[in-house]
Amino acid sequence: MNPLALLVEILIIIEVTTKNSEAERYNRKQKEVNVTTQVSVSKVKQFLSHLLEQGKANKIANKRENPLEKKKHQHKLKIKGIQNKNLLKRNQNYFKKPAKKSITDKGDELFKMGNKILQESKSQKQKTEAYTFFTRAADMGNLKAMEKMADALLFGSFGMQNITAAIQLYESLAKEGSYKAQNALGFLSSYGIGMEYDQAKALIYYTFGSAGGSMMSQMILGYRYLSGINVLQNCEVALNHYKKVADYIADKLEKSEGIPVEKVRLTERPENLSSNSEILDWDIYQYYKFLAERGDVQIQVSLGQLHLIGRKGLDQDYSKALYYFLKAAKAGSANAMAFIGKMYLEGNAAAPQNNATAFKYFSMAASKGNAIGLHGLGLLYFHGKGVPVNYGEALKYFQKAAEKGWPNAQFHLGFMYYSGSGVWKDYKLAFKYFYLASQSGQPLAIYYLAEMYATGTGVLRSCRTAVEPYKGVCELGHWAEKFLTAYFAYKDGDVDSSLIQYALLAEMGYEVAQSNSAFILESKKAKILGKEKMYPMALLLWNRAAIQGNAFARVKIGDYHYYGYGTKKDYETAATHYSIAADKHHSAQAMFNLAYMYEHGLGIAQDIHLARRLYDMAAQTSPDAHIPVFFALMKLETMHFLQDILFFNFTTKWKWLKLDSTIGPYWDLLVIGLIVVVLIFLLRNHHR
């Protein structure tokens, strides 16, 4: 970015923030004094040395664990290494003076070794080994390794969260021009975690971070400009930020498909997280293995797929994937044959890249009419892998696979018409196939749809229509892996580590992370924020999630205004949010709450008939609402009946008894008492 343009952008940001005087006054009230003890660089180095020392014992005690347990306890693993008594003295001034060339080269080498391990494997054991190299490289003054270690301290990797130490490292790194550190400081400022709550400062940090090349900062700014968070809402600016990240993600996806990450909602089943469908329970996994060994072909293929891409909480394991696919292929599974072809086409440790073997298995699958096999043959002819480039053959196989509904084939058909590869360019056909593939979530199809809308290629240009799919592609970045580590941290009771990971993802615009962060804050179990901040921050996050279409979050906003959590009691505003959730999202809970407010005239005019109707609608919408609705209607009809009897001989002028206000608050106790009396009566008759 041009320095002058950057300066102008910062001045605009400062101007916008000064105009929002009310917001600034609120921010000043929300600021808290940073009482955390400042950690010297030497103490940070001592902490890194401690990490380095702790892993040595773990390297010796290499106990066998199941993949799900390793994944679950990944944040408790310790880093391997050795102890050096002169560590602190030698390195405490590495920020002040440049390290010797030999030390710098060694630090770079160690960082590259660690980074290679980190990128090439999803195994937690190997990730732990990577951090051994990062620790040693950081000790030698390698800035990139220090960034890795600062992240580990911030997010609580290996069970050693120390936000104060992380901030100290980030501040030193930011002075050295680290865009990752600037992004982290912006994030911490935006929540007031370990630092003053300062949205204006956060925005400046993000601006510098994005100028330096931080994809996270780009994404955060894109979300802020899209939603108008502390900046003037501007779709074009949001589009510009999101496109940069989407281009980066699309380039990665063209080289490999990427790994989808399960985004577990803590709000759906908080009392029984282990049974969440997004994560495979260990007992169920063992049962599936048993069935696979007994010859269940469908289970063999399913386990092969899970291990191939590392889904449902399982580590990516190419050897196990190939093992199950070979067993299923031997039994005649066309899907298994196609996946084996895919493994050999892409190449990995278990199946080295081999076009001839890939062609063999794709052909076997295609002969059975398998869509994945047909698409695989199309890829070989399109790219000329093991066979001469032949766009005609590629088109034929892509069409056959697309007719069977395979989204990757639909995308490649669209791409051929979009780029004019072997066919005349036809943007209408390209749009058609991109759209079909996007309905199944094909990420590159979504990206090219966004490209067409952003540039007006073959369609009418629309910023809003383009920015949403760009945002969806951006959310496929490697940073989404924090969803799993945050989930397992929460499940294991490490609430602070879980919250800070969800909070970062929430800042980047992930709706699920916004809901999960608000849910954790609402529980008041976290210690990294003051209790007085939790409800206001939770309300802010519920609101952001609701704007993105979360019905549960919309009901929560109504609840906060109804009870006065993090804001003043406001029945009228509560009723407004319940109405939105009921009308737009058909939420049974919102219908029930709104019915209660109509029944009692809270924030809206009393309307008994509308209350009855909403109670009935709640029962029809959700079976879970039947019993609450039954009791609510029983109470409503009882009160109405008693009022009719007692007021029968009185004119309106002499209505002195207000049963609803007198008995209303205790109606649930009265109903329970009535039920108890009826049960006693029935039991007595039964014994007679």
UniProtKB/Swiss-Prot annotation:
Domain of life: Eukaryota
Assigned GO CC terms: cilium; endoplasmic reticulum membrane; nuclear speck
Keyword Acyltransferase attributed: no
Residues carrying covalently attached carbohydrate according to the record: 34, 162
Residue stretches in coiled coil: none
One Pfam family here: Sel1
PANTHER family tied to this protein: PROTEIN SEL-1 HOMOLOG 2 (PTHR11102:SF53), SEL-1-LIKE PROTEIN (PTHR11102)
Protein name per Swiss-Prot or TrEMBL: Protein sel-1 homolog 2
Originating species: Rattus norvegicus (Rat)
Taxonomic lineage of the native organism: Eukaryota, Metazoa, Chordata, Craniata, Vertebrata
